[in-house]
Amino acid sequence: LANQKGGVGKTTTAINLATALAAIGERVLIVDLDPQGNASTGLGISRTDREVSSYDLLVGEATVAEAAIMTSVPNVAIVPSTMDLLGVELTIAEHGDRAFKLRNAFKQLGDLTINEKPVSYILIDCPPSLNLLTVNSLVAADAVLVPLQCEFFALEGLSQLLQTIEQIRSTLNPRLSIQGVVMTMFDKRNNLSEQVLHDVRSEMGSLVYDTVIPRNVRLSEAPSYGKPALLYDLKCAGSQAYLRLATEVIRRERQLNAA
């Protein structure tokens, strides 16, 4: 999940999409690559429980199996983030394989099981910038999911992200595709939300998911309780939207694999 703009619902989407995928039978690993560690906090992982983190993964001091922690969400594990990530670029900058650190770590993924079964989805929560952490994510990923808020300037910066994705695809990861664009923070009472949604769909076409994530109080409240919205209030509009998004993601992935 990538977007160099902050505040677009990226971490909220990572947490709740993972939970929704798990609810329909998938086994999901989240890799928190944002030094702020909001995905880790939002899943109830305290700072003291992050003895091994995504930093250790990138510098080669831990395997995915060693870094992953089971969360309170059934079938969801996370490789948590710490503030150490702020210095990881300096640590690996001189390494010839600096863009491939995460991909190399994933080569040992077979060691990790969730409830004795292999992981079926890995969701990488990228930082809100196009830095080496995001490049590592794009090099390691099969596809990119782009959260975009239904607010003015939503498309600002998107062209730069799409250009970066194309550069990664042409040089470092030819299998990389765009899974889709998910519109977040949609307010049906607001004409601007409708206009932005229309503009983005006109610009991006079928890449935009049918599911739109509403602006929802429960989605905002849930992280302060260390829970995804689906565990905090399953019936709220936000939770139901993420369940629909999960089914769309699975359907699109099957279409991409069949292509």
Please give the residue ranges for each predicted region.
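P-loop NTP-binding core
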Residues: 1-259
